């Protein structure tokens, strides 16, 4: 996870900005696009005093194996070889040779090259609503979505959960090089009445990639935390 985004999430946690779980439910964090599981471990350790579970999803077989090994000795961390989408139980495909490459950039490129959205390796998709439906007794308090282009689909599969739990969300988009996808993600967040704050920090490739933190517009405390963070960042940059 990028430095500034991590600092902002730690500030939100330190200032008690995450929603409290609903009565008789377990508070949860979703790390979707978990890669090798290192960010999921960081989240578990940072959130330990809140007794939150971290559910890490990673579609690539090799990455999921590494993440699963990392999780063996970490309490409250659960790893699944799954992708996120808008239809629970659907199947996605990719060339098997991607499992021989550590970098997730190949999946990111594949989102925009139709010929790479097929292959002899596959993974199942689930939805946020399926993972956090009422029968699970879970409350989603934070979702970190690093889905290499799949953020919009994940948000479309989260309507009930976003309405019920109002979690903090982080998403990654490319406002210039992948403008249509960026606008779609922003429109979905607006439809759920989320205010979006953009972290001025380059992520991934192409170089216009940015992280965004979205918080429920009605949550004044969260908005104050983020307004303060970005005001301080601007003051530090001023000559």
Ranges and model annotations:
Residues 1-239:
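Phosphate/nucleotide-binding beta-alpha loop and adjacent structural elements of enzyme active sites
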């Amino acid at each position: 996870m990028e430095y500034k985004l991590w600092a902002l999430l730690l500030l939100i946690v330190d200032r008690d900005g995450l929603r409290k779980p609903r009565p008789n439910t377990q508070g949860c964090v979703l790390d979707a696009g978990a890669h090798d599981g290192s960010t999921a471990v960081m989240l578990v350790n940072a959130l330990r005093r809140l007794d939150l579970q971290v559910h890490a999803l990673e579609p690539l077989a090799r990455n999921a194996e590494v993440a699963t090994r990392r999780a063996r000795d970490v309490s409250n961390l659960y790893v699944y070889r799954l992708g996120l989408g808008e239809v629970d139980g659907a199947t996605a495909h990719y060339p098997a040779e991607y499992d021989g490459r550590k970098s997730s950039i190949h999946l990111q490129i594949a989102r925009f090259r139709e010929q790479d959205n097929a292959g002899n390796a596959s993974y199942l998709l689930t939805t946020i609503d399926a993972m956090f439906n009422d029968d699970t007794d879970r409350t989603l308090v934070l979702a970190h979505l690093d889905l290499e282009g799949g953020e919009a689909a994940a948000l479309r599969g989260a309507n009930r959960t976003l309405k019920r739990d109002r979690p903090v969300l982080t998403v990654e988009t490319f406002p210039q090089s992948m403008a249509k996808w960026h606008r779609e993600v922003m429109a979905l967040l607006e439809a759920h009445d989320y205010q979006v704050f953009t972290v001025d920090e380059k992520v991934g490739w192409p170089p216009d990639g940015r992280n965004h933190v979205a918080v429920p517009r009605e949550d004044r405390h969260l908005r104050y935390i983020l307004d303060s963070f970005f005001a301080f960042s601007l003051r530090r940059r001023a000559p």
